[in-house]
Every structure is written in C-alpha cells, then in structure tokens.
C-alpha cells in the first residue's frame, strides 16, 4: 500500500489506498477464514468435531481480530434479536448459526463436516474449521493453528473433552463475543457454568498435562502454549500490554 501510494503521489493522482484484512463487508456480509487440519479417519470423527466446539466458541478471547459491531449485527435477546453497536472480540461470532454441519452457506457452522479430505480418503479426513477471524498478527495465527493441532493430537491419543460441552453453543459464542472481560457465564450441558477464561484455561491445562507425558512437541508448539498462558493472564488482569505486540 505504501509503494502504491508513493506511485500515485508521483503521478499526481489524488487519493490514498488502504489495505484491510477482514471477514465482512460494509453491508454485514461475511466470508470465512478457513482452517484445514488433516486427521486420521476414525469412527468417532463426529464426536471429535463436537468436542472441539467449546474451544472454538471461546478461543476468540485470544485470537479474535476484533470488530466494531454495527448495522447488520444481531444477537439473541429474549424472544427476538437486537441490533448491536459496540466493540467485540470477533467479526465472525455473530454470523455463525450452527455448531457442526455440511451446509456451510445456509447454516454457517463452526465446523464444516463434508467429507473432503484432499488426501488419501482411506486414511484421512479433513477437520475444516470456518469460524475463525482473519488475523494479522503472526502470534494470533500461531496460537490459533497450534492450539487446534495440539487439541487434535490430544483427542487422537484418547483424550476426552466431552465434559466441557456447552448447552447452547450459538448463544455462548455471542455472549463470549460481546463480553470483553472474558468473564461471562456460559451454561454447560451438565447444568454448571463456566467462563470463557475458565474454559480456555481448562483446555490449556489438559494439553500441558498431555505434553508432560512425553508427547513430542516442536519449538513452535511450546511458544504457542506459552503465548496462550500469557494471553489468558492479560485478559484476566485486564492488562493487554502483556501481549499487545503479539495478538490482534
């Protein structure tokens, strides 16, 4: 953009070019940031997909790109929907309407379950996540991808996250998005409540325990786990300067 603006100025052309990276246009139409993870073909793919939902609902407190909600943004309010105009965690959260589905344009799910592995179909499936924001900070992308990679590895090693299931993921993703403290109470399927901060901390703790059992991890994975912890600390203490050069 800077080079283009320099050429415009040198040519005497008025105006200025701005480059933006987002997941929605001025009319509120959305477009996804797609993440694709290669997973082993197992009989419990659907269970794994549903197990990932609480993380995908709440990870926006760390890797959301931020958004000023305006016209076209709605969330449940009583028996209807109300317009919102405030700063929120994620551009995508208010546009998602299902947890897992193969109907990506009609239902806008967190996870697209169509069986399109783009690999050896006998051995692999694709975990296709479409709820994420388009990030600019490299740290955000690292944390977003590495956290999912570790979580999928945890599940493939027999880990269980089903006890953290949410009663209403679509309400939870909106409530999480619009509470910038990370402290809103989300109802779990077992009737108990948990905050997005607590949900992310619980996931991080289980993955750290998993790694401590001797699971091989790369330096990037270690960096992501450390950034994850500092990101939660920054939100818990309301001190964004702890990670303000690393996360969007």
List the predicted regions and their residue ranges.
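Substrate-recognition/cap regions that form aromatic- and gly/pro-loop-enriched pockets
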Residues: 226-248
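Active-site acidic/histidine clusters and adjacent loop/turn architecture
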Residues: 1-20, 186-230
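Loop-rich catalytic cores of soluble enzymes, especially ATP-dependent carboxylate-amine ligases
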Residues: 15-26, 31-193
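Low-complexity, intrinsically disordered regions enriched in charged/polar residues
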Residues: 46-50, 83, 105, 201, ...
